[in-house]
Regions:
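Short, highly charged C-terminal tails/helix-capping segments
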Residues: 192-206
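N-terminal secretory signal peptides and thylakoid transit peptides that target proteins
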Residues: 2-18, 22
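Bacterial Sec signal peptide processing site at the extreme N-terminus
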Residues: 23-43
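Surface-exposed short loop/turn segments
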Residues: 99-152
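Surface-exposed flexible segments
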Residues: 21-26, 119-123
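Short secondary-structure boundary motifs at beta->alpha junctions and helix caps
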Residues: 74, 149-189
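N-terminal segment of the mature soluble domain
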Residues: 45-114
Length: 206
């Protein structure tokens, strides 16, 4: 645990969400908060590809979030873009060639949805589930710039978590962290399978 001061700008973006009440409170004082480790893939064997390089980008755009949901991408404990950048450079081994592997995040959706909680006297004796966090990512890998041809694969992964109303900011971030880890783990498995099946011209087997 590390004592850190949270950036108030993130809380302003989230104004009205369940996370906002915790983050705005943290703006006023130092709070013992967990520093979350990056999600990495160095323990997995890289996929060798005959490409000159790998480039990563988020082309998903701002996206439309309909009330009562809130966009929480700016308050996640780890960055989906940074995580996929780590994935691309740790899981794809560019051996050299004429093409480039473009790893594009085409969907990057993380929202908080408020849930109805019990009100009145009964609510004083219950600990209701107060928010649901929903995440979804779609990643597309394109091989471009190779005179021999082009190719692409795509995979999507989604997950959700619900949290009770008495959860602290650290507990809420733990739920978000676990959700992101689940999403990228599934993306890793699906993308590698798609690459081996449909980008075999560039994937070096062995």
């Amino acid at each position: 645990m590390t004592s850190v001061r949270f950036d108030r700008r993130n809380a302003l973006v989230l104004a009205g969400s369940g996370l906002a009440s915790f983050l705005l409170g943290a703006c006023q004082t130092s709070v013992d908060r967990t520093v979350w480790p990056d999600i990495t893939f160095g323990h997995r064997e890289a996929v060798a590809m005959s490409v000159a390089g790998v480039e990563v980008s988020d082309v998903s755009g701002p996206g439309a979030v309909q009330p009562p949901a809130y966009d929480i991408r700016n308050a996640l404990p780890v960055s989906p873009l940074a995580t996929m950048d780590a994935w691309a450079h740790q899981r794809i081994n560019a051996l050299g060639g004429y093409g480039t592997a473009l790893v594009k995040i085409t969907e990057n959706r993380f929202v908080e949805v408020p849930l109805e909680t019990e009100q009145g006297v009964g609510g004083l004796f219950t600990n209701s589930q107060s928010e649901r966090y929903e995440g979804a990512m779609t990643v597309r890998i394109e091989i471009v710039g190779d005179p021999a041809g082009q190719g692409f694969v795509e995979a999507r992964s989604a997950a959700s978590r619900t949290v009770p109303e008495d959860y602290s900011i650290n507990q809420r971030e733990q739920a978000l962290y676990d959700m992101i880890a689940t999403i990228v783990k599934n993306l890793d498995e699906r993308l590698v399978a798609e690459m081996r099946a449909n980008l075999s011209r560039w994937v070096m087997m062995g």
